[in-house]
């Protein structure tokens, strides 16, 4: 949350609505920080884990396979990733942690150019030259060279779209239509002309605000690093969230710092069995906590109206069950879902929360056993599709799961090996839709058949996979309905208004987290948000 929280009273009762990774981790951290507090976690589905879903199924021959239907990797440089990995170590599960080495083929990333050819995102001199000679590289040199000379926003501190700030800073719209649009489609499933620069493109936004330009920010940062280099070499310390985490749980600071530095060496991290391994491990740990109760498959339908002199809060479930006298309610579901739970006397708050729409993402998994049909030159993490491509299939991007899985290495369990390393198979996940599905703000989802046929056409055109191999493969179709809040221009101002209105209505009884209220929708960020708020409530 943006606003501060106050300490819970002794033996307080807490309700958590939403059993995704945000709700699970908030519950885990708070239950450890305050064992006296009784926590009840409510999840509408029969499983916890939310949008992190590593689906264990079988192929057409009856052999077990795992298909990722959500996020699958983590960035090693994130503080939230350190919290995840340290939690796994605490629970004796560090053997599941896997890494992708720098320079590994699985770290290669591609963009789709206007002629439907894959172009590697530069990571060397030769790939930089190829990129600059491609239409995707148009405007890049002149845009970067002239960036220092271009004027700041005429309205400093005012939010604007990512497209607007990029076009102003780089002096053309090629960069935003090509590289930037592809990147943000992959993260947010949305359009650069709509996304908030202040929310989703913070570095560029604040570089201009504080330094005047990105070039000047780079110069100033280099000077600062040069001055502090000797000090850093002598004494490196934990900062921010990791410092608070170390203090809160009495961690060995040097070991936590070593873990953080180790993880930063790797561009990507993952978990054996898929990323859902983490929420499953946390759920299993919570099942053993005496102060935690988990209710699944019985959605909360209402936050009960309370008398003016009442300080506790109650919930009503779909079954008709009522859960009363909670001292604190944590909501980790999306803003529109929160709006549906509010009593009628909170109509103005409901309308405010309903202002935020969400994008729907369609996921299509393709699996072909015993054959690798991705060309050797195109092996990598996958590719994203920029606005500059005509893109009739409304494709956001494609992830090459089989390439990633074959190149994972156990990070801490050096004696074990990757069982997929020598296996020949093809596994990819296509991401479709997002903002491109929306008609008048409402997602219109095409049928399974139409969507899979569009993905087949894309894989044939972009990767050269034959129709025979496409027809021989196994296909899975999943709709992640309204899974990603739309972080449009003005989102931060909206969030502050919403949180203030919540506190006006409920005081310190209600807090919010999850994708709609954390720094970003990424898994590490919602976990950091959950820890920070659990810490405030525990002090």
From Swiss-Prot:
Q: What is a single cellular component term in the Gene Ontology annotation?
A: mitochondrion
What the entry lists under Gene3D superfamilies is as follows:
FAD/NAD(P)-binding domain
| Name of this chain's protein | Protoporphyrinogen oxidase
Q: What does this protein do?
A: Catalyzes the 6-electron oxidation of protoporphyrinogen-IX to form protoporphyrin-IX.
Q: What's the source species for this entry?
A: Saccharomyces cerevisiae (strain ATCC 204508 / S288c) (Baker's yeast)
Q: What else is known?
A: Present with 5350 molecules/cell in log phase SD medium.
Q: What is its EC number?
A: 1.3.3.4
Pathway(s) of this molecule: Porphyrin-containing compound metabolism; protoporphyrin-IX biosynthesis; protoporphyrin-IX from protoporphyrinogen-IX: step 1/1
Instruction: Name the keywords, alphabetized.
Output: FAD, Flavoprotein, Heme biosynthesis, Membrane, Mitochondrion, Mitochondrion inner membrane, Oxidoreductase, Porphyrin biosynthesis
């Amino acid at each position: 949350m943006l606003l501060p929280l106050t300490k819970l009273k002794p033996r307080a009762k807490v309700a958590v609505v939403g059993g995704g990774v945000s709700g699970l981790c908030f519950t885990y951290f708070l239950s450890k920080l305050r064992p006296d507090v009784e926590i009840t976690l409510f999840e509408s589905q029969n499983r916890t884990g939310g949008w992190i879903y590593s689906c264990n199924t079988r192929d057409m021959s009856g052999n077990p396979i795992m298909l990722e239907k959500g996020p699958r990797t983590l960035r090693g440089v994130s503080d939230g990733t350190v919290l995840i990995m340290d939690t796994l170590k605490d629970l004796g599960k560090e053997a599941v942690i896997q890494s992708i080495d720098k320079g590994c083929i699985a770290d290669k990333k591609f963009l789709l150019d206007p002629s439907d050819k894959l172009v590697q995102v530069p990571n060397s001199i030769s790939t930089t030259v190829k990129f600059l000679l491609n239409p995707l590289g148009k405007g890049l040199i002149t845009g970067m060279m002239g960036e220092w000379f271009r004027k700041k926003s005429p309205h400093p501190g005012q939010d604007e779209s990512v497209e607007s700030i990029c076009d102003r800073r780089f002096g053309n719209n090629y960069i935003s239509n090509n590289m930037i649009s592809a990147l943000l489609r992959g993260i947010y499933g949305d359009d650069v002309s709509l996304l908030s620069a202040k929310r989703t493109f913070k570095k560029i936004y604040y570089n201009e605000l504080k330094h005047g330009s990105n070039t000047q920010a780079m110069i100033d940062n280099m000077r600062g690093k040069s001055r502090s280099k000797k000090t850093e070499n002598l004494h490196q310390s934990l900062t921010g969230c990791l410092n608070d985490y170390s203090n809160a749980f009495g961690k060995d600071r040097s070991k936590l710092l070593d873990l953080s530095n180790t993880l930063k060496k790797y561009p990507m991290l993952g978990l054996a069995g898929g990323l859902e391994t983490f929420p499953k491990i946390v759920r299993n740990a919570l099942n053993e906590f005496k102060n935690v109760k988990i209710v699944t498959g019985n959605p909360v339908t209402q936050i009960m109206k309370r008398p003016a002199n009442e300080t506790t809060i109650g919930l009503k479930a779909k079954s008709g069950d009522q859960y009363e006298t909670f001292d604190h309610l944590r909501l980790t579901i999306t803003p529109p879902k929160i709006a549906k739970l509010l009593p009628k006397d909170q109509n103005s708050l409901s309308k405010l929360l309903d202002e935020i729409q969400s994008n729907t993402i369609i996921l299509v998994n393709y699996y072909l056993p015993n054959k690798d049909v991705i060309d050797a030159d195109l092996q990598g993490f996958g590719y994203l599709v920029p606005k500059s491509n005509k893109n009739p299939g409304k494709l956001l991007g494609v992830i090459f799961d089989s390439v990633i899985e074959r190149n994972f290495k156990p990070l801490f369990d050096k004696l074990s090996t990757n069982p997929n390393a020598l296996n020949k198979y093809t596994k990819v996940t296509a991401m479709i839709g997002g903002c491109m599905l929306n008609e008048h703000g409402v997602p219109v989802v095409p049928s399974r058949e139409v969507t899979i046929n569009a993905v087949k056409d894309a894989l044939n055109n972009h990767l050269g996979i034959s129709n025979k191999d496409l027809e021989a493969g196994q296909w899975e179709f999943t709709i992640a309905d309204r899974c990603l809040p739309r972080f449009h221009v003005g989102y931060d101002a909206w969030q502050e208004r919403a949180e203030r209105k919540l506190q006006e209505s409920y005081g310190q009884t209600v807090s919010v987290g999850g994708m709609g209220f954390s720094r970003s929708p990424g898994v590490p960020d919602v976990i950091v948000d959950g820890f920070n708020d659990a810490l405030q409530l525990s002090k």
